[in-house]
Amino acid sequence: MPAEKTDCYAKFQAYMGGDPWLNTKELSAPFSAKKPAVIGVQFMGDLFHESITNEQIAAVFGVMAATPQHQYVVLTKRPKRALQWFEWMSAWAKASGIKDYEVRISLAQLDNLIDRRHHVVYPEWPLPNVIICASVENQKAADERMPLLLQIPARWRGVSVEPMLSGINIGPWLLDEDGLDVDGGWPQNHDGLDLAICGAETGPGKRNFKDEWALDLRDQCKIAGVPYFFKKDGSGNGSLCGVEYQEWI
């Protein structure tokens, strides 16, 4: 995992109680980053919030396409909306007479956003530098969001279990439908999850977290050959039982 990480990128903000507006200063920030970085993408916590238009989301993807040196992690609790956006993007591409894997960078050509030195012509699609992660906190959320996430035609898909509020079984989504289940212990190339991120809730009023929950998730990923990244325990420590787990795609 690259050493540099920016947590809040492409912030959309509500202005005077009206419609969200695109913060072009934040959106253009990746162009001025001097070194490749792992960048977290958020819209007030979720890029795929219902109030964000398809065109605004496309502008963010346009910037990600134009900066292939960076890796982007898009966290969402709304995989259904994300899937709808990818379907919209595919339909738009067909209506425009271009192939599904081609991205029209013009969607990101907003005023004062990308200068003439930055341009992309038909980059690879889905973008190889973007990881779409569903955020889940317990088994119920995983059962609801994981099937939708795996329908999204993203190059990389992952799960972010943060804050982890209970033990979670992600075995059904670690391997593809034709692969052996995680209990069989057969790591392979698959169309299931590509990454698992895990972390506890911290700060005042934090809810309960148990090391064994995170260790069990680690074991599930190890059996399936899926990278496991542990962020922090309830005290903010970046290790789990004294061991750091920072595997990455």
Language-model features: where?
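Structural preference for beta-strand elements that scaffold enzyme active sites
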Residues: 38-40, 71-73, 129-133, 156-160, ...
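Histidine/lysine/aspartate-rich catalytic loop segments that bind and position anionic ligands
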Residues: 136-138, 142, 150-177, 200
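Conserved Radical SAM active-site core
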Residues: 1-129, 139, 168-178, 190-193
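Aromatic/hydrophobic pocket-lining residues that form the small-molecule binding cavity
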Residues: 57, 142, 214
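Auxiliary Fe-S-binding modules of radical SAM enzymes
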Residues: 147-151, 171-249
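Short secondary-structure capping micro-motifs at structural edges
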Residues: 117-122, 144-148, 183
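Active-site-proximal loop/turn and secondary-structure-junction residues that shape catalytic pockets
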Residues: 45, 78-80, 136-138, 163-165, ...
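Pocket-edge structural micro-motifs
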Residues: 29-31, 42-43, 134, 200, ...
